[in-house]
């Protein structure tokens, strides 16, 4: 009889092992056997919880997108009466949270984006994540700007966030957070009306 609570522990072990494997060898070279070995379980456990490698990759990406959502929401909930500028910076901060800019997370996101072009479930996850970012940004800009300008500013800030993140991921170096925050802050202040 399985131990109570073991499913969540095993799932966490396997997702962490998947991130480690992707970080070291990439998504395509990360085998079920390697992931199982890293997690200290049999390959059958992966099949039991996730069906196959694609199921495990989907669960891993759901976990990373959930961490992103939590990082943003935690910052926004800390600013219930915050200005649009403060709340936009909170969204930026959530996107540059350590859970999203660690080497393992960055490599997983890159692999996820590439695979999403060919796998419908990953594509849907990618679209949800992108729409959530844009919706959050536009909503905050909308507090200060007409709809069309808010949409343009939201799209521009989303592109800046993604661009800064992508440049760091492809450089193999950690994201320069002070620079990223400075550039995004400048963008935000340029698009919000001055008092």
From Swiss-Prot:
Pfam families: TetR_C_6 (PF13977), TetR_N (PF00440). It comes from the Bacteria. GO terms for molecular function: DNA-binding transcription factor activity; transcription cis-regulatory region binding. GO terms for biological process: glycine betaine biosynthetic process from choline; negative regulation of DNA-templated transcription. HAMAP family: HTH_type_BetI. Repressor involved in the biosynthesis of the osmoprotectant glycine betaine. It represses transcription of the choline transporter BetT and the genes of BetAB involved in the synthesis of glycine betaine. This is HTH-type transcriptional regulator BetI. It comes from Escherichia coli O157:H7. The lineage of its organism: Bacteria, Pseudomonadati, Pseudomonadota, Gammaproteobacteria, Enterobacterales.
């Amino acid at each position: 009889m399985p131990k109570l609570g073991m499913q969540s522990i095993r799932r966490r072990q396997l997702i962490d092992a998947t991130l480690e494997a992707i970080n070291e060898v990439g998504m395509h070279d990360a085998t079920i056997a390697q992931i199982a070995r890293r997690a200290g379980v049999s390959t059958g456990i992966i099949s039991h919880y996730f069906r196959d490698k694609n199921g495990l990759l989907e669960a891993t990406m759901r976990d990373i997108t959930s961490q992103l959502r939590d990082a943003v929401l935690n910052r926004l909930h800390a600013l219930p009466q915050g200005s649009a500028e403060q709340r936009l910076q909170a969204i930026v901060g959530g996107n540059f949270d350590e859970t999203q800019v660690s080497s393992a997370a960055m490599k997983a996101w890159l692999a996820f984006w590439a695979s999403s072009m060919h796998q419908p479930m990953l594509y849907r996850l990618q679209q949800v994540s992108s729409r959530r970012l844009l919706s959050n940004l536009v909503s905050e800009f909308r507090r200060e700007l007409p709809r069309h300008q808010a949409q343009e500013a939201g799209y521009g800030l989303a592109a800046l966030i993604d661009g800064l993140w992508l440049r760091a991921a492809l450089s193999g170096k950690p994201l320069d957070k002070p620079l990223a925050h400075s550039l995004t802050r400048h963008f935000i202040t340029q698009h919000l009306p001055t008092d």
